[in-house]
Each structure stands twice: as C-alpha cells, then as structure tokens.
Amino acid sequence: MSAASGNREIHRFPTDGTTDLAALIPALGLVPGTDSFVLLEGEGWGASVLAFEPERHLVVDEDASPFEALRDSLACIPEDVHPLEGGSGLFGYLSYDAARHLEKLPTIAEDDLRLPISQFILPRYTVGVRGNEMWVSVPAGEKPEPIFRMFERASPLLRRSPDPVSEVRSSMGSDGYERAVKTIKEYIRAGDVFQVNVAQRFEVPFEGDRISLYGALRSVNPSPYGGMLSFPGFAAISSSPELLVRLSGRTASTRPIAGTYPRGEEVNGLLLDPKERAEHTMILDLERNDLGRAAAYGTVRVEELMTTETYSHVTHIVSEIAGQLAPEKDAVDLLAAMFPGGTITGCPKVRCMEIIEELEPVRRSLYTGSFGCLGKNSMDMNIIIRTILLKAGVAYAQAGGGIVADSIPAREYRESVAKAAALLECLGASPP
C-alpha cells in the first residue's frame, strides 16, 4: 500500500516483526564514520527508523547557533506526518556544547575531540518498522523497488566477541572523580547549587566492526531510545534510556531519570532512599520549570511520578511531565527550553554547567547532548547517555551521576563505573 504525504510517497507493507534495520546498513553500502545516516531504535521512539542519503546536510560549528540553523532548515520542510512515520524531517544531534548558544559559559575544559556542535540530515530515504508493518519513504515520483531489493542482500548481524582490552583510560580516575564530588559538596554547602551532575570519560582502543559493536550493545543493554549516528569522521552507538523532549501535535513531554542503584539491589530501597529521592525531586522541579518556559500557562503536569526502570546493570527512578505548547512557540523553542537536560547538569542549571566546565577536564562533546528527529510540528529527541563514540581508532564512553549534599564520594564513583559497565563490556574492557 502506498500513500502521498507532502512531497513524499510512503509505501507500506506487512512484515513478520523480525526485520532488523541495523542489518540493512551494510546491505545499503553505508559505512559508519564515512557516510551520513541516522538509525533510531527502541520502543520509546515508537518505531525503528533508518534515515540515509542526505538531500541536505546541516553542519554547525561553534561560531553559529544550531538552534537558529534548525529553525531555518525546518522552515523549508512542508507540514507533514511525523518523521518517525515517514514524513519529511531532520535527523541528527546536538552536542552538549550547543548549550553555549543558550547561556554564557566559561571555556576551561579541553575540546580534544573537536566535533561539530550539531549535525542534521534531511534524508532522501527513510525506512521504518513498527510492529508487523514496514514502510519505505521516498521522494514523490520515485519508486521504492531499489530499496526493496536491498532487503534481499541484508544478512543478520553476527555477535562477535570483542578482543580483550588491557588498558582503560579515565579522564579523572577514582581519585579525581572523588575530589570532584567533594568540591561539589563544598559548593552545595556554600549555597551555590543544590545538585550537580559530574561525569568521567573512559577510552579504549577500537578498530573493530562498528555494526557488530552496535549489535552487541543492543543485545547487552537494550534501551528505549537507542540508535546509531554516522557522520564523516566519527560514529556513535547508543543505548540511551532517556527522553529529553517529545512534541506530538501541541503536546510536549519529557521523561527525566534521576536516582540510580546497581541492578540486583532492592528496588524498594531505591524508592525509599532519601538521597535518591532528593536527587529526583530536585530534577523533577527543574524539568517542570524548563517545560513551563515553552508550555501554555497552567498546562504543565506530572503524568507519572517516581516509577522504576531496570536495565542490564542499573535501576533508575523515572517520572513523566507533559504540557501544551504555547501558541507562540515552536519545536525549536521547546528544544531550547529543555536543552541540555536537567538530569545531566543539575540544579540550578546554569551554575551547574559552570561547575561542570571547571571540574571535568575534557569537553563532553556528544555526551549528554541529544539526538533524534524533528519535523515541522513534531519532535523526538533523547539524551545522549550510555553511548560509545568512535573516532580515529578510539572508543570513548562517558558516565556520571548527580551529586547532592549527602553523596558519598566512593559510592558516586562506583555508580559512574556501573553506568559505563555495559559499554566497556561490549568493547572487551573491564571496568576500572
């Protein structure tokens, strides 16, 4: 079955529910780190989508605003169905440093990866799977048969055991991380902040197959907002559990995660832990305020309060907040209001970002930024955590946690390592 939507034709057909879009990447001849494509996978997205062969490629360096660039690009896109349903849209990422175009921040940490702060593509083709339905979206007038033929060439992803890695380097180490926690607690006692999220970066050599690595991570740590980004010079594979912001019609929502126990510890203990509840409550208030900057007055509400979600190595406390977008606001206004996520900065957000810049020795780059897709009146963007960045023969994995007044430095260090454990395991490395 086919249908026209704006300037595109969407061809739908039934499938047996086992179609693997990641396996289609090599069949299409796409090379991670060379070709530009975006894969979104996980039940949180509502569909798995592969977007490729850019008609336009938006690359923004630090001297230009990625938010204005997005607004200009969206102005050229027709009102259409959601990009996750085959409509026109932009697929890509904002790095954490895109926040420098929202707030005046110091420049202290080393920008050693030197990646663009934002890249989005307007794809010529998208392929999507939802349940037992598959669709191929092509420009109006084009036939989908060439893409259909590629499915016949797709082979299942093979799970290869990684070669063991003897050395894992950390940007901070246990001593440095614990010193950072102690410094944050001093800022809290002085009344500067209530909570700060601090992170460390692990790196290991990696020359393996990137598609296989993605398959391994997806198997070890399945997640609702995962996927793969590929742009010239680097790739990123993600098992993110967290939604930054969604816009569907005029309904805006966010789903913050704050509060973590290692998997295997008592879930009720997590929900009753004063430190974890305090962390979550502060972030919940921050996210309500952020959403309120773009929502119509009086519409912001908590839809779900302090439930738990369990992943391969950790259990989190999660809530959901929603509101109606104000009449004078658009998707980019909403994204700017929510960015970067409060769960990965702390409260109050701007002062926390200043402290993060002071304490973390290297820039976060993609980590704690956001990737996903935007349409004319729709948006789904995650938070880039539980993600491996691959560049020039090195794999980078970052993890951290929220520090509050009664945080215990050694425990916070162990929590950050637990969050990185699934990533390091896929790389053949043992947590330090």
Model-found features: residue ranges?
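Extended alpha-helical targeting/anchoring segments
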Residues: 1-432
